[in-house]
Amino acid sequence: MTTPADVHEVRDPELPGRLLSVERDALLPLLRARGEGDFASPVAACPGWTVRDVLAHCSAALSRVVESRYDKDVFSPASNQRDIDERAGWTITEILDELDRGMAEAGPVIAKAGGPLDGVALGEWVHAGDVRVALGEPGAYAGAGLPFALALLAQVTSARGHLPLHADLDDADEPVRLGDVSGERPPARFIGDGPTLVRLYAGRPVDEVAYELAGADAAELNIFG
C-alpha cells in the first residue's frame, strides 16, 4: 500500500504546475499592490540582487521554459545575469506580467519534460519566499504552497539521488521521506517545521529557529549549491 511518505517514488508530472498556480494566486496580487520603491529592496538570499532582479530572473526562467529557449549555459549565473540585464529597461508591470504568464503556462511544459525541469518550479517558489523576506511580508517559504513544495522537494531529491532524509514535521500529519530511496545509506533525521526544512534544502538561513538534524550536516542538504 502506498503511503504519503512514498508518493515521491513515482513522479507526479502535474505537481510543479500546481505549485506554480498556487503561488501565482498568492504572490502576484501582493506584488502588484507594492510601491515602485519596494522593488529596489535588497534580497539577502541573493547577494547583489534586488527584489526587481529576483523577479526578473524568475520571469525570464519561466519564459525560457514556456518557449523552450535553452542556451548552452542556461540557468547558469552568467545566463541568469544576462536575463536580468535584458530586462533593465522594463517597467515593474512588464516584469510582473511576464512572471504572471510564466507561472500560468509553464506547468504543462514542465510536466511533459519528464522531470529535468521540476527543480525550476521549486526554485520559483523558493525565490517567492526570498522576496517575501526582503519585503517584510509574512509567510516566507510557507503558506498554501508549502504542502506542494514539500512533495516536489521529495520528488526532486529522490530523482537526483540526494542523501536520504526522514522528516517528522510539526505542521504535517505524515512524515516526509526525501532523497535516495535505495537504502544504501541510513537516512538522516529532521524534526521541525516545513518552512525550516525548505530553508535548509534551499541553503537559506535558519537562525533562531528550533529544529533537530541528525545524520547529516545542514550544508549537505542544499540542492541549489
Residue locations for each model-derived region?
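Structural signal for well-ordered, non-membrane alpha-helices
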Residues: R24, L28, R32, L62-V66, ...
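Helix-loop segments that flank and shape redox-cofactor active sites
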Residues: L28-W49, P108-G115
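N-terminal capping/interface segment
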Residues: M1-G37
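Short, helix-capping/interhelical loops that line the mouth of catalytic, cofactor-
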Residues: T2-L15, S59-A111
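Hydrophobic packing residues in well-ordered alpha-helices of helical domains and bundles
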Residues: P16, L20, I92, L96-L99, ...
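Short, structural beta-strand-to-alpha-helix junction motif
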Residues: T50-V51, T91, D193
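Structured surface interface patches that mediate subunit assembly and partner/cofactor docking
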Residues: T2-L15, S41, Y70-V74, K112-G225
